[in-house]
Amino acid sequence: MKEFEFLKAELDKMKENKTWQQMKQIETKQGPSVEVKGENVIQLSSNNYLGLTSHPRLVEAAKRAAEEFGAGTGSVRTIAGTFTMHNELEKKLANFKKTEAALVFQSGFTTNQGVLSSILTKEDIVISDELNHASIIDGIRLTKADKKVYRHVDMDDLERVLKKSMNYRMRLIVTDGVFSMDGNIAPLPDIVKLAEAYDAFVMVDDAHASGVLGKNGRGTVNHFGLDGRVHIQVGTLSKAIGVLGGYAAGSQVLIDYLRHKGRPFLFSTSHPPAVTAACIEAIDVLLEEPEHMEKLWENTAYFKDKLVQMGLTLTKSETPIVPILIGEEEKAQALSDLLLTRGVFAQSIVYPTVAQGKARIRTIITAEHTNEELDRALEVIRSAAKELQLV
């Protein structure tokens, strides 16, 4: 057998099914427009909701930290890699999320893996929304707990599962705060109400809600006025926050336990000084410059309204994630490719990221987009969709 022949066969099948994707290379800093293959294109695919990736305050904080503390830390947190700034960031995150404590992980993905794999045992059950992020799914797979999946945001189905799982040590309901492929918000008040009625715990992944929802971007828990009633909040520092990493926030007991049992935290080198300092500065920007969130929502409302007027089919998004439903993988890829040739970077999302036949162009609006950029992007989308007979 040729080396990895079985892998090549699978890759060939992906190409045949139009689910193969070529990574596009960006040649400038992230922003409302970027350069791809030497051409300036409007960026509608990044998670840089507030434009903080290139905010002068974050860039300057990163520069200062690198010059003073070096390029890296040289150790894991539990041995010799905890700098003063790491503790400062965690205190700031805990205050921001209105919890007793917080712990920073190397990524949002490893945060979910670390939390779920460490706190769940064979005595427990984890109850997960069917459209939760891949990191939640993989985190659950690492546990010995029983697993149940409830239909997407279906509270009757969630209650059915809760009623049938009364004999476990802990029942943990896990949900995305904002669902990344559709842009809808979890019905968190209803989830919390059921959890309290059936003595269950709640964990919310606010990857796409931190910096977007709630006062100053505190997330879905704060958005719904549920501070103190959700047991575990996780999120990223790489989307609206604009840098890198993930975090868990909750009680002091939870965070102390994760420090000792969270394997991704225990066995990964701590974040470089530049990354940590930029994250600290990002939280300060959220607290001190609310105009970024205001502009984000203004741009989102404008863009959605114009797409609907075109006759395009959108998901029931409630956030700056604005997916245009296409259906067939080949058509979604064709539209994405055509948009790029005309100056709009809007990535297609196909199987296995979404279900087969549910392919889409997922656009994400940011605070940095100007009206002129949005209008230009809208015109390109309109003409390309018409050319491909999608409207």
Curated annotation (Swiss-Prot):
Extent of the signal sequence: none
Pathway: Cofactor biosynthesis; biotin biosynthesis
GO MF term (any one): glycine C-acetyltransferase activity
UniProt binding sites for pyridoxal 5'-phosphate: G108, F109, S180, D205, D206, A207, H208, T236, L237, S238, K239
EC top class named in words: transferase
Alphabetical list of InterPro entries matching this protein: Aminotrans_II_pyridoxalP_BS, Aminotransferase_I/II_large, AON_synthase_class-II, AONS_Archaea/Firmicutes, AONS_Archaea/Proteobacteria, PyrdxlP-dep_Trfase, PyrdxlP-dep_Trfase_major, PyrdxlP-dep_Trfase_small
One Pfam match: Aminotran_1_2
CDD domains per UniProt: KBL_like (cd06454)
Catalytic activity: 6-carboxyhexanoyl-[ACP] + L-alanine + H(+) = (8S)-8-amino-7-oxononanoate + holo-[ACP] + CO2
One of the protein's GO biological processes: biotin biosynthetic process
Residues with the N6-(pyridoxal phosphate)lysine modification: K239
Keywords annotated in UniProt: Acyltransferase, Biotin biosynthesis, Pyridoxal phosphate, Transferase
EC number: 2.3.1.47
Cofactor: pyridoxal 5'-phosphate
UniProt binding sites for substrate: H133, T353
Subunit structure: Homodimer.
Function of the molecule: Catalyzes the decarboxylative condensation of pimeloyl-[acyl-carrier protein] and L-alanine to produce 8-amino-7-oxononanoate (AON), [acyl-carrier protein], and carbon dioxide.
Family, per entry: Belongs to the class-II pyridoxal-phosphate-dependent aminotransferase family. BioF subfamily.
Protein name: 8-amino-7-oxononanoate synthase 1
Biological source species: Bacillus velezensis (strain DSM 23117 / BGSC 10A6 / LMG 26770 / FZB42)
